């Protein structure tokens, strides 16, 4: 080790053995404000935190940027792109950026306007280890060393629910036996008494339903709440190690200017001028009417107070927002009444409709208040599944969920084009919520693309996407193991009091302290996501929110069941995909030399055929008869019924020799019509040249006369062929 290197270790005890996360600094990236290399086994992530010299005074937000660089050399691979180098970040990298950003952002001092960038680079990857939680810890540690106004450290761990135990930092192989997988980030309270939860990203696994059916405990709300508690010791140990490293290696904290959005005198003046009118406007239930009145009150506020604060006009808008936030929160905490008049546990009006769009394979429209989501399902052959070139060991995705959030969904103008990080994150959350209930490849051999169109937004379009997608998938005929619904929960904290809100509005998301999204079936949770603006939330509060969310989820599932109770018949416009299993040693026969046989079957049937290494063959066609024709041809080659003497076939002559003609009876099964048998086709005369009687490609009715010990088949012309040829002559 270099003399300048300092290190600290966090040792986390699990039921399957200890996990050691090692933090090192001083050897790499020395010009960064803070740089840390985090190790977990052979996985190695470098995080570098840098800060701009001067603030961006014109900004009204904190300019934090988080980037994750996946280096393919980390897994001993060359990128699969045309230029053979890394390009735009993968979806996994983008999702990891969000995992890092979410707990880091609220930990910086309010009012900071210096640009801060955190870059996490994956240098080495153990194929059985997930790097995302290592990157979160590395990012927190490097930021701790950078001399910034940062209230870290933040510890993050993944916990998997395996065989009834919560295991910290589970491996890929352990997660295959897990019923729930959860990433939890948090911080230790100043008095050291507890760990406050700051971020959660969790989901049931694709194998959850099968594992539960086999006797494994289901990930119910109680189990998930226990998982949050199980994550705390690991978070505490990771924070301890980061603090130990920072104690010896951190730069002294620099003085950074903090830009206050407004001063108290502006807020007090606004309260006196328009406080009562603003409170009345906030009691209007309808969003459109409420926002119209709020705009009027806002204009009135500017008119009344702008002359009193010359040169400080920029303070009026944030002060008005602060007053709005205060009134909204006060009414909820004091009266238990929300902006639109609902109680804290009430859900907005629900609507669900399927088969909304013609010709598509499946569609649904789901509405919750003013939030409106259109779900559309497309089915295709398995060869259309997505190929993924990332550090993730899964190289393909059969289920692809895309989420679109056009600007008109909020009544605004804006850029339309490639998805932003938020859209990718929302799509991934909805995808994870549905993965546990999707049928297996064997049960439903289709590639599935689900698109969620957020047509109107006023609170939790991501959870609306889960509901719309469930409806759309069922409408497309996908045999889901159970329907899934989702709900977004909010939180208001005033002092030591916490008020949990069911089905939050967009404004409640903006003015509240937490966005907690929970999706699941009637029986268990399939996905959840927590973001908070606080320094942390007690796990007991989250446990209560989980139970409140369950009651709402069951209500939504009832409404969805009224729209569609189970999988519909597949659309006439959807492809038909069937499968057939053949012996592995027959794969070559089905494909044929240079693909001759499989190409012939595809040409004859019009079907598309995909052959798997295990002998499973998927056949896709525009209709059922075409698929069945291809399956019959494949079975004739690989799973043939042995022909018997006396059976008759309408065969095709495939080859002529001087001793007879070879006739194809079924694909891969030929018989010989000897020249001596041809005199029956020539009026009893001896045939000198086979070509005088028969030609390649000619259809001929034949009968099996003999099958020798080696399986060679001898044929004779059928009576129909004798009559046909005689009539022709």
From Swiss-Prot:
The gene is pnp. It comes from Parafrankia sp. (strain EAN1pec). Its cofactor is Mg(2+). Keywords: Cytoplasm, Magnesium, Metal-binding, Nucleotidyltransferase, RNA-binding, Transferase. It catalyses: RNA(n+1) + phosphate = RNA(n) + a ribonucleoside 5'-diphosphate. PANTHER family: POLYRIBONUCLEOTIDE NUCLEOTIDYLTRANSFERASE, POLYRIBONUCLEOTIDE NUCLEOTIDYLTRANSFERASE 1, MITOCHONDRIAL. GO terms for cellular component: cytosol. This is Polyribonucleotide nucleotidyltransferase. It is found in: Cytoplasm. The keyword Cell cycle does not apply.
